[in-house]
Regions:
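Active-site machinery of serine-nucleophile hydrolases
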Residues: 1-26
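Structural recognition of the beta-strand scaffold that forms the well-ordered cores
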Residues: 13-18, 62-63, 90-93, 118-119
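Active-site-proximal beta-strand/loop segments in catalytic clefts of secreted hydrolases
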Residues: 18-22, 65-67, 93-97, 123
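Extracytoplasmic/secreted cell-surface and envelope-processing proteins
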Residues: 25-26, 71-73, 100-103
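Helix-loop module immediately N-terminal to the HCX5R catalytic loop
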Residues: 28-59
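Soluble non-cytosolic domains of exported or imported proteins
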Residues: 34-42, 67, 198-202
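Surface cap/lid and interfacial helix-loop subdomains adjacent to catalytic sites
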Residues: 45-57, 78-229
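Gly/Ala-rich beta-loop-alpha elbow adjacent to hydrolase catalytic centers
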Residues: 63-73
Length: 230
């Protein structure tokens, strides 16, 4: 939560729920995933409902989750009421996949569109993908230049100062990271060399923070009817 707080604290007002996450060992067995994930989803749904009833006060909102949290965001998108979705600024599904285009899932096309879903998974190349995280994904965008084509973007690693190249592969919908030479990214148990799942937040935290503010300001400027009355 320290990293999340650094990214979201300040001008952004955020609500982060406690919920029962499954262990990494769970992902080694499909039967364990099927048995345990409903508990996590149930906790997040209840927490989101509590947030709407006690903290949101009719305001527009952003959903954001990473990895297992991103799975929960997809679940919320697929189960929320239309009236709730009408106040959604954007949903950030980071380090996971969107495999079903439900009524409330619209892929982001640029940096400022609204009611959309942002999704990406970072790898060195396609051979480094983890099927659990990205197989069958239908939604992707480059979080540096906010394009959905293969136009590359330069990114300075906020932790080390290294200059990286970030390119969306439009066939696999994986985000290719060029120039990363460190070995501090391996995901325990199910990770592999060249899969940058553990960097999906830290590399792009500044990009995400700025984009959340941009989309929120855009929503407020064009959708005053969605704002609570004084």
């Amino acid at each position: 939560m320290v990293g999340v707080n650094q990214m979201l604290a300040g001008e952004l007002n955020y609500y982060s729920p406690y919920y029962r996450q499954v262990t990494m060992e769970t992902y080694t067995s499909d039967s364990l995933v099927a048995a345990r994930m409903p508990l996590a989803y149930g906790d997040v749904r209840k927490s989101f409902e509590y947030y709407l009833n006690h903290y949101n006060h009719g305001r527009p909102f952003i959903l954001a989750g990473f990895s297992q949290g991103a799975m929960a965001v997809v679940d919320l998108l697929n189960t929320m009421a239309d009236s709730t979705y009408s106040r959604l600024v954007a949903a950030y599904v980071i380090g996971y996949k969107v495999t079903d285009m439900g009524a409330h899932i619209r892929p982001a096309q640029d940096s400022a569109d609204l009611g959309v879903t942002i999704c990406y998974n970072s790898v060195r190349d396609n051979s480094c993908a983890l099927p659990l995280l990205s197989d069958g994904n239908l939604v992707a965008i480059n979080p540096v230049n906010w394009r959905t084509d293969a136009t590359p973007a330069l990114l300075v690693d906020p932790r080390h100062g290294d200059t990286l190249t970030v390119t969306l592969d439009t066939t696999s919908l994986l985000l290719h990271i060029g120039g990363y030479t460190r070995d501090d990214y391996m995901l325990p148990l199910i990770g592999c060399e060249g899969n940058y799942h553990c960097l999906d937040l830290s590399l792009f935290s500044d990009c995400l923070r700025r984009n959340m503010a941009l989309r929120a300001n855009h929503f407020i400027s064009i959708a005053p009817a969605a704002l609570p009355k004084p």
